[in-house]
Amino acid sequence: MKRPVDFYAMKESGEKITMITAYDYPSAKNVEQAAADMILVGDSLGMVVLGYDSTVPVTIDDMIHHTKAVKRGAPNTFVVTDMPFMTYHGSVDETIQNARQIIQESGAHAVKLEGAGEVVNKIARLTEAGAPVVAHLGLTPQSVGLTGSYKVRAKSVQEAQELIDNALAVEAAGAIAIVLEAIPRQLAEKVTKALTIPTIGIGAGVETDGQVLVYHDIIGYGISRRAKFVKAYADIDETIEPALTSYVKEVKEQTFPEVKHSFTMAEEDLKGLYGRE
């Protein structure tokens, strides 16, 4: 299993880091079999697998539950777990307690926090306490309720400079890596070159040190539309729907199950059960 020191070495050598967001045992198992470097258990599970319209309702217990499943499916892969909405915006002590609970109960190797500002101090204190932290800048889904959209961030000079400053701040605070989401590729390249820690891009161009996409987006499973930055590697939904429809139809028509799908009992045992005729 790769560790932060390995990710630093990969950045240094130019080898790209692969991260996939997964939420359960079978998807994590697939990800590990594909030899991805990291798994992110994102609070996006709220929308992708729990059916919420945002990440806001996701709880610590949700994150622990899904991370434990991921760990069982990918025991040899570095796992990062999101700290959900408002679990790191109270006191430092509350933040440390919440991170401790996630790491101890789920087995996550690191936690991810969105944003900068007051979050920078939380990253520093978590690092001091021994909890590895991945930062997340650019489009931060937990704050969409305030910003009102999932549009590209940091397109103006002022916003771009602020993002660069924030990236340097979270690095100085001890973050082991930074997710850069939905920012101009030129800015992502500048940030990547300015930092000694790895950058993991999603909708941030090719020059970041690594890339992350959601498992469901990659394989086309249960999604209504793909974002611009998502490449369609498969479309599993096209296979799933007709398969389920065929099953329902065959049961109704009594063409499933066939004899070959059934178990049998020896004739002698049947006679013993029902009596000899």
Curated annotation (Swiss-Prot):
Binds 1 Mg(2+) ion per subunit. 3-methyl-2-oxobutanoate binds at D43, S44, D82, K112. Mg(2+) binds at D43, D82, E114. The keyword Hydrolase does not apply. The active site is at E181 (proton acceptor). GO terms for cellular component: cytoplasm. Pathway: Cofactor biosynthesis; (R)-pantothenate biosynthesis; (R)-pantoate from 3-methyl-2-oxobutanoate: step 1/2. Its cofactor is Mg(2+). GO terms for biological process: pantothenate biosynthetic process. It is an enzyme of class 2 (transferase). This is 3-methyl-2-oxobutanoate hydroxymethyltransferase. The lineage of its organism: Bacteria, Bacillati, Bacillota, Bacilli, Bacillales.
